């Protein structure tokens, strides 16, 4: 079976693993998935991530919990293959009045909404995390 939207698959695996109180989740790796995982780690939503360098590289994400509850309360895909969403730096929305983040793919790499606004770059709005 071919996968049409690997980013949605990644977000769904994270959401399902946290609902099942799993310590870690594994998935096929790509450069974009690693960049998203790096942003999630920098913002404190996951413990860590690692990429195995076998024949098919696997991305393993160590999930984070606080007081027995998942740190990620909501993780949602915004731009999808059937309907891409692009925003200028001034149009990038604030998630939960700054308590959550939007992950944006820009010409300067994958970054949070705050970083994109401060650097004055827009791009594709990949997902929101709260």
From Swiss-Prot:
InterPro entries: Ribosomal_uS8 (IPR000630), Ribosomal_uS8_CS (IPR047863), Ribosomal_uS8_sf (IPR035987). Keywords: Ribonucleoprotein, Ribosomal protein, RNA-binding, rRNA-binding. It holds the Pfam family Ribosomal_S8. SUPFAM superfamilies: Ribosomal protein S8. GO terms for cellular component: ribonucleoprotein complex; ribosome. One of its GO terms (molecular function) is rRNA binding. One of its GO terms (biological process) is translation. NCBIfam families: PRK00136.1. One of the primary rRNA binding proteins, it binds directly to 16S rRNA central domain where it helps coordinate assembly of the platform of the 30S subunit. Part of the 30S ribosomal subunit. Contacts proteins S5 and S12. HAMAP family: Ribosomal_uS8_B. PANTHER family: 40S RIBOSOMAL PROTEIN S15A. Belongs to the universal ribosomal protein uS8 family. This is Small ribosomal subunit protein uS8. It comes from Neisseria gonorrhoeae (strain ATCC 700825 / FA 1090).
């Amino acid at each position: 079976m071919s996968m049409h939207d690997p980013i949605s698959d990644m977000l769904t695996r994270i959401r399902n693993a946290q609902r099942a109180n799993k310590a870690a989740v594994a998935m096929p790796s790509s450069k974009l998935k690693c960049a998203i995982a790096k942003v999630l780690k920098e913002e404190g939503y996951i413990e860590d991530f690692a990429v195995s360098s076998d024949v098919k590289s696997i991305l393993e994400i160590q999930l984070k919990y606080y007081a027995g509850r998942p740190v990620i309360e909501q993780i949602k895909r915004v731009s999808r293959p059937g309907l891409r969403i692009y925003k200028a730096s001034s149009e990038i929305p604030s998630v939960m009045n700054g308590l959550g983040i939007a992950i944006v793919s820009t010409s300067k790499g994958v970054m949070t909404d705050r970083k994109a606004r401060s650097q004055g770059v827009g791009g594709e709005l990949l997902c929101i995390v709260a």
